[in-house]
């Protein structure tokens, strides 16, 4: 009887220990899976955010470059320099338009309005740069400077503000 009591007492003690052991193993497996999911989601978010910020940096740089090239066209004195500047502006505009198109995939619903504003500001800037180059080519430097320091400068500044606004949400 004493032997049977010892066995049943051992069993009574071991059953909760085994149950706790099984629960801890299951709990650890679930915790590891949850950590992997969180890590995967965080990596995806971080990668998207970093790529988004990189694209925005390229857009910002191209915008500033185009604005500077517009002013360079005004101060150019010979035809070859003007033609070279126009080619550079067209190249930069093409790259910027590609960057804007590539950036669309990162635009969230909350950023859509700001992105649309950015594109509209670029379109205004692009149109007025054409006017700057026309005035400059005709020798109307004052009108060209007025546009460069007015509408084009304002559009460029608005684009920079749009980019800052989008970066804040990332």
Can you name each region flagged by the protein language model?
Residues 1-54, 61-81, 133, 167-170:
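Hydrophobic membrane-targeting segments
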Residues 77-90, 96:
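Extracytoplasmic/periplasmic/luminal assembly and interaction segments
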Residues 74-83, 104-164:
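Polar/charged, Q/E/K-enriched amphipathic alpha-helical segments with strong coiled-coil propensity
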Residues 31-34, 38, 92, 121, ...:
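Alpha-helical structural motif
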């Amino acid at each position: 009887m004493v032997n049977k009591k010892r066995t049943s007492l051992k069993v009574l003690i071991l059953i909760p220990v085994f149950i706790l052991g099984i629960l801890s193993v299951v709990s650890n497996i679930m915790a590891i899976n949850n950590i992997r999911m969180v890590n995967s989601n965080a990596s995806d978010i971080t990668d998207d955010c970093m790529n988004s910020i990189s694209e925005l940096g390229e857009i910002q740089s191209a915008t500033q470059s185009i604005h500077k090239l517009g002013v360079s066209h005004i101060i150019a004195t010979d035809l070859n320099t003007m033609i070279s500047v126009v080619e550079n502006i067209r190249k930069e505009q093409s790259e910027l338009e590609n960057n804007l198109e590539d950036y669309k995939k990162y635009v969230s619903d909350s950023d859509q309005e700001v992105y649309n504003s950015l594109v509209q500001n670029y379109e205004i800037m692009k149109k007025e740069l054409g006017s700057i180059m026309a005035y400059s080519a005709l020798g109307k430097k004052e009108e060209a400077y007025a546009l460069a320091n007015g509408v084009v400068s304002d559009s460029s500044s608005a684009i920079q503000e749009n980019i800052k606004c989008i970066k804040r949400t990332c």
